[in-house]
């Protein structure tokens, strides 16, 4: 059904009876020259507006805001009521502007206070308003033409705002009854006409205005449904600025508007051209411009609106960007704006600044952290728009890193399991209706939420936080325990899984326990199984209330966890034996380390003594009185000498390196020439002297002198 909301048609009915010429009694200072006044000049007396003037100004302000933000498809019809109804404009788009309305109101003029009040009534205007609502607008006619034979599907709704001076609450009820009867009669006429439409819904807003200082004879009343077609609400408001504030509040309610206050606007002072001051300007726009604030929950941005408005205003600061490239910020929405105080100097300066082709970036006020530019003011085609800039992460950027979250590195998360979890909880169209046990219709969305709640009752996000979800043996139980109801086969599979875990514990099979962040070998095998059983019990207990069969699974689990006394005794003996093995293993390791150190020290001493002997031999080998050299074996045969007894434990790194160096040096050493030519390992000395002097050597190889 093509529905036009109540905001599509708005009819203003303003009372033009003689009592509306009465003063509102709210004085306005006419003579503002309080300084440098010449003595002897009498100041002008303050003036006050009439109830009629206050009503016209407030209604015009209502229309101005509506036309600024909704130049199309939001229509206003203005009616003045005295001795008859005077319709000032029509539903055509050409008549929808302030100039036409103000020219028509000027032609009507103020009410005549000397006219006969008995001949004047607001009822004439209310009847004309109902008749006007039955007329078809251009947009409704276009929609009916497109639908052709289904033209009756186009809706017709509207709103009547009546500003009058009622006498009492009974007078207000009489006006409501008149409107209700008139709607009923005109709906009958419209049913038989091709040029009229029946009123499907009408909102009647009665505003009782009275002079300042008087007591109100009419009580306020919130919106009340008088019939399926008519709803009514009553507002009792003092004239003057109070009436203007009330109309400002109503226009925000009727058209879903929100308020934004621009703070810290730098402006030149008129008196001092070299100085500037900061001003604030409040703007009205559609509430969708604040959707991001509502989603993010930034409640601290709100503040009280001017004149005690019913809604809070969002405060944004004038921002001076470091770059002139506005295209760096991409826009997600643009909404027309309307200043609340359009005639004030700050509002005028801001609008002129924007209409000259300038743009203003707006940032969220923050006590700490970097600035967040969330909105921008700019004009297009002579109209000012509030642009919403995306202050969140762009979908084109890389996703944020989760390394700073609870899991640490990305690989620590159960990413594969989470993908399977999402696949099992996808939303799909649900065509066939389903019913609950009690016979009520089951809503697919609620059923999906309930399933998601069941699957997330116990679902660790990090691999190191779980044991059972890392075990393939637990999958048959974990996959079915989240169901709303279990079959006998499901219960049997769960019991088999539990018995399989008991068998694993009896065999002392290892478990996939994460040791990240722990020192040593981690928890003992008995402690690992205790952790596993506790986690499995937590999972089953999270779903125990689903059905009776879930209770049977828990009973089986608890029965298997309660071990017999001999089993506990065996576990204790096993733990004692493990402790003894750990102690003996530690003692053996300490002994082997000490033994290796002693062997390395002994080998080091042998090598040092060998170096000393070689040095002494070098010193005395050229001396004529040198004694007979001791019997020495060739160095090449050092490998044949008995090695230092190796320890039964592992050889130290020093021993391995020393042996390697000694072997390499022995192969590089040039052997002594006498040892190479010796007989029976004995070499004859000074043979060249014998050859020169003819001396003979003794038997033992020593030369004798003559």
Swiss-Prot record:
Residues 615-636 have a biased composition (Basic and acidic residues). InterPro entries: Cell_cycle_regulator_Mat89Bb. Its main location: nucleus. Changing residue 227 to P: In a colorectal cancer sample; somatic mutation. Residues 564-603, 615-650 are annotated as: Disordered. It is found in: Nucleus; Cytoplasm. Belongs to the Integrator subunit 13 family. This is Integrator complex subunit 13. It comes from Homo sapiens (Human). The gene is INTS13.
């Amino acid at each position: 059904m093509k529905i036009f909301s109540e905001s599509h048609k708005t009819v203003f009915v303003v009372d033009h009876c003689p009592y509306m010429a009465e003063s509102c009694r709210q004085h306005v200072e006419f003579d503002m020259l309080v300084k440098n006044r010449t003595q002897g000049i009498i100041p002008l007396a303050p003036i006050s507006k009439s109830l009629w003037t206050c009503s016209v100004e407030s209604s015009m302000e209502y229309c101005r805001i509506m036309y600024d933000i909704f130049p199309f498809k939001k229509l206003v019809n203005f009616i003045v009521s005295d001795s008859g109804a005077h319709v000032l404009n029509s539903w055509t788009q050409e008549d929808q502007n302030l100039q036409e309305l103000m020219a028509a109101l000027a032609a009507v003029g103020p009410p005549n206070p000397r006219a006969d009040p008995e001949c004047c009534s607001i009822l004439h205007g209310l009847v004309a308003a109902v008749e006007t609502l039955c007329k078809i607008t251009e947009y409704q006619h276009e929609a009916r033409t497109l639908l052709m034979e289904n033209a009756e599907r186009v809706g017709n709704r509207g709103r009547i705002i009546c500003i009058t001076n009622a006498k009492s609450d009974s007078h207000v009820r009489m006006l409501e009854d008149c409107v209700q009867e008139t709607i009923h009669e005109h709906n009958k006429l419209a049913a038989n006409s091709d040029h009229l439409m029946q009123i499907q819904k009408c909102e009647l807003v009665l505003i009782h205005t009275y002079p300042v200082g008087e007591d109100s004879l009419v009580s306020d009343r919130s919106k009340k449904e008088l019939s399926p077609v008519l709803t009514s609400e009553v507002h009792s408001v003092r004239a003057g600025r109070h009436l203007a504030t009330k109309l400002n509040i109503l226009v925000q309610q009727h058209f879903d508007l929100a308020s934004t206050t621009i703070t810290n606007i730098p402006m030149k002072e008129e008196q001092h051209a070299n100085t500037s001051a900061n001003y604030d300007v409040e703007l009205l726009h559609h509430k969708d411009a604040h959707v991001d604030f509502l989603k993010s929950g930034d409640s601290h941005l709100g503040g009280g609106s001017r004149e005690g408005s019913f809604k809070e205003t969002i405060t944004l600061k004038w921002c001076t960007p470091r770059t002139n490239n506005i295209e760096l910020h991409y826009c997600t929405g643009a909404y027309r704006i309307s200043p609340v105080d359009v005639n004030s100097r700050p509002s005028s300066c801001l609008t002129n600044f924007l209409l000259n082709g300038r743009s203003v970036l707006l940032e969220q006020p923050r006590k700490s952290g970097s600035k967040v530019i969330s909105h921008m003011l700019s004009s297009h085609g002579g109209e000012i728009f509030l642009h919403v800039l995306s202050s969140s992460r762009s979908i084109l950027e890389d996703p944020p890193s989760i390394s700073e979250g609870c899991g640490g590195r990305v690989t620590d998360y159960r990413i594969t399991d989470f993908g399977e979890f999402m696949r099992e909880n996808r939303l799909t169209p649900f065509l066939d209706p389903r019913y609950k046990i009690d016979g009520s219709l089951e809503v697919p969305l609620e059923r999906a939420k309930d399933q998601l709640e069941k699957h997330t009752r116990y679902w660790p996000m990090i691999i190191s936080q779980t044991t059972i979800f890392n075990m393939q043996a637990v999958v048959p139980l974990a996959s079915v325990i989240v169901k709303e109801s279990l079959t006998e086969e499901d219960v049997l599979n769960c019991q088999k899984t539990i018995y399989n875990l008991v068998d694993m514990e009896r065999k002392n099979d290892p478990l996939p326990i994460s040791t990240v962040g722990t020192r040593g070998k981690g928890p003992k095998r008995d402690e690992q199984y205790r952790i596993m059983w506790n986690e499995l019990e937590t999972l089953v207990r999270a779903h125990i209330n689903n059905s009776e069969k879930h209770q049977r699974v828990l009973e089986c689990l608890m029965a298997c966890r309660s071990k017999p006394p001999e089993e506990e005794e065996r576990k204790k003996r096993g733990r004692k034996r493990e402790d003894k093995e750990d102690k003996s293993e530690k003692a053996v390791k300490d002994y082997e380390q000490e033994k290796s150190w002693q062997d390395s020290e002994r080998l080091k001493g042998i090598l040092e003594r060998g170096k000393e002997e070689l040095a002494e031999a070098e010193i005395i080998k050229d001396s004529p009185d040198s004694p007979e050299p001791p019997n020495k074996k060739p160095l090449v045969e050092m490998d044949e000498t008995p090695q230092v007894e190796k320890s039964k434990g592992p050889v130290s790194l020093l021993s391995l390196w020393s042996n390697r160096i000694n072997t390499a040096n022995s192969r590089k050493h040039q052997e002594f020439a006498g040892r190479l030519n010796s007989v029976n390992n004995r070499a004859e000395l000074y043979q060249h002297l014998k050859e020169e002097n003819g001396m003979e050597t003794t038997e033992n190889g020593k030369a004798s002198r003559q």
